[in-house]
Amino acid sequence: MAITATRLVSLTLLWIVVLFVTLALIQIKLTDVADPSVNEKILDAKLNQVGEDLEGVTHKVYFDIQINGSPAGRILIGLFGNIVPKTAENFRSLCTGEKGVGNMGKPLYFKGSSFHRIIPGFMIQGGDFTRGDGRGGESIYGDKFADENFKLKHTGPGFLSMANSGPDSNGSQFFITTVTTSWLDGHHVVFGKVLSGMEVVRKIEAQGQDSGVPKANVIIFASGEVSL
């Protein structure tokens, strides 16, 4: 009887431990769901973790960023040229500046242009190298070009997508998401993703306002292409 009682006590203690661990795991899960910032940090970590291993990246380009004249870091972006070749090539060429001067008399080059629209909890937008206020920009194909396809989706932070003023109005303006923006699917062409430097994107995001007007001067100090 003494052995049976000992086993009973051991089993009881084991069940208590199992129950405690289960409740702790449930609490952790509920905390993640209740706190969006936790989920955003997890998404950012996953984004950086898989960055260099993303399948389908055909080119890598970069932005070196300055905020109010001070270096803020580099954003490395992968382009999906197999899925959206025309859109990816437009962006790649604008990063290198290899196409020279456009029809508007301005260099087809992101270098020196600003992030003119920054909305925290949404996205950062740039690419207007002709006017700098969101009313300009030019593609390497002339002025505007058609939406290539909407195969890629805005499924999290760090996706690169074309800004537009309606269907088939793509130029040089782009945005990088800082959250999931699924309502933009089917309206804006996704063509790339941040591979590294999401912390720089967050620095830029911190300079935004609900109005979209930046609180600081955020400049693409240098841009170009790097080898795969």
Curated annotation (Swiss-Prot):
Residues 62-225 form the PPIase cyclophilin-type domain. Expressed in leaves, flowers, roots and stems. This is Peptidyl-prolyl cis-trans isomerase CYP21-2. Its EC number is 5.2.1.8. The gene is CYP21-2. Gene3D superfamilies: Cyclophilin-like. It comes from Arabidopsis thaliana (Mouse-ear cress). Pfam families: Pro_isomerase. It comes from the Eukaryota. One of its GO terms (molecular function) is peptidyl-prolyl cis-trans isomerase activity. The lineage of its organism: Eukaryota, Viridiplantae, Streptophyta, Embryophyta, Tracheophyta. Belongs to the cyclophilin-type PPIase family. InterPro entries: Cyclophilin-like_dom_sf, Cyclophilin-type_PPIase_CS, Cyclophilin-type_PPIase_dom.
